[in-house]
Regions:
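Residues immediately within or flanking Cys/His clusters that coordinate Zn2+
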Residues: 26, 43, 123
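Cysteine-rich micro-motifs
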Residues: 40-51
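Short cysteine-rich clusters marking metal-coordination/redox-active sites
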Residues: 29-32, 46, 126
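Structural beta-strand segments of beta-rich domains
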Residues: 72-76
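Cys/His-rich microdomains that often coordinate metals
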Residues: 36, 50-51, 130
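Short metal-binding segments enriched for Cys and/or His
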Residues: 52-65
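Edge beta-strands of extracellular beta-sandwich domains
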Residues: 128-139
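Exposed aromatic-hydrophobic patches
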Residues: 77-78, 110-117
Length: 139
């Protein structure tokens, strides 16, 4: 329960999402870029502001990333601006029982590798356009 909810008397029950990491929710601070991944909805704040859940969308033409198997890894690539004002903040690989984050920074290329631990989803967050997702290919 957040302090704001407690003071307002607005207490909401958190629905259990059965602990499946693929059903998790991403929250991103619009000020500093801090990221929270939660298995259910929550009330999070950062830098004095409320963090809102991000809705993952299918990649558009500017955010269409490729997922390629190289040995025992998923190799994710995307040709995207990586300037201080417009960049990919993180790429994550989620399966039913785990999640792995790769934090990216301006002027760094978007080429993370993730050890394959099962079928899952790749999530990619653009600081200007939001969260995008795609299923990993079948092994």
């Amino acid at each position: 329960i957040s302090v704001a909810e407690l003071l307002a008397g607005d207490i909401r029950a958190n629905a259990n999402r059965a602990g499946n990491m693929l059903k998790g929710v991403f929250y991103v601070c619009t000020i500093c870029g801090n990221v929270v991944h939660a298995l259910g909805e929550g009330s999070f704040s950062c830098c004095g502001s409320t963090m809102f859940p991000q809705e993952a969308e299918e990649p558009d033409a500017d955010h269409a990333f490729s997922i390629e198997r190289i040995e025992d890894d998923w190799y994710v690539t995307l040709d995207h601006p990586m300037t201080k004002d417009h960049y990919i903040s993180f790429v994550a690989y989620a399966t039913m029982d785990g999640i792995c984050f790769k934090k990216l920074y301006p002027e760094q290329s978007v080429q993370p590798r993730f050890h394959i631990t099962g079928r899952g989803r790749i999530y990619l967050y653009c600081n200007q356009h939001g969260l995008f997702t795609s299923l990993t290919p079948r092994k």
